[in-house]
Swiss-Prot record:
InterPro entries for this protein: MraZ, MraZ_C, MraZ_dom, MraZ_N, MraZ_sf, SpoVT-AbrB_dom, SpoVT-AbrB_sf
CDD domains: MraZ_C (cd16321), MraZ_N (cd16320)
Designated gene of the protein: mraZ
Family: Belongs to the MraZ family.
Keyword Repeat carried by entry: yes
Protein name: Transcriptional regulator MraZ
UniProt entry keywords in alphabetical sequence: Cytoplasm, DNA-binding, Repeat, Transcription, Transcription regulation
Native source organism of the sequence: Corynebacterium kroppenstedtii (strain DSM 44385 / JCM 11950 / CIP 105744 / CCUG 35717)
Top-level taxon: Bacteria
One GO biological process term: negative regulation of DNA-templated transcription initiation
Amino acid sequence: MFFGTFTPKMDDKGRLTLPAKFRDELAEGLMVTKGQDHSLAIYPRNVFLERARKAAAASRTNPEARAFVRNLAASADEQSVDGHGRITISPDHRRYAGLSKECVVIGSVDFVEIWNAESWNQYQAEHEESYANGDDAAFMDFL
């Protein structure tokens, strides 16, 4: 499982060092894809394939589901962590997430998110108060 917030720097070649505590769970391969809120999502390869199969099975008759699966599959990039603990973020993924040198990597329980640092700070500013107040229905499910 993935927990925590980290602020690695991305180099000019689009390489980003993943937190050491995430690497073991991603050692068997990983998939980078476009995530929600213009972030990137990193899944362990086996988790991504399982979710993609479920999504594809549900998408045959629903136009919105088909569009989701197309975007998910078209933006998926299979990778492995290099000997220095890095992955390379494609130019298209960098564009989608607005990534530059300053990045934020967060654990989202069963996957990892990569954010533009400014976008993450803005997201936190917009959502932190409702989290603190317990306004979210998901919060109630957690309790």
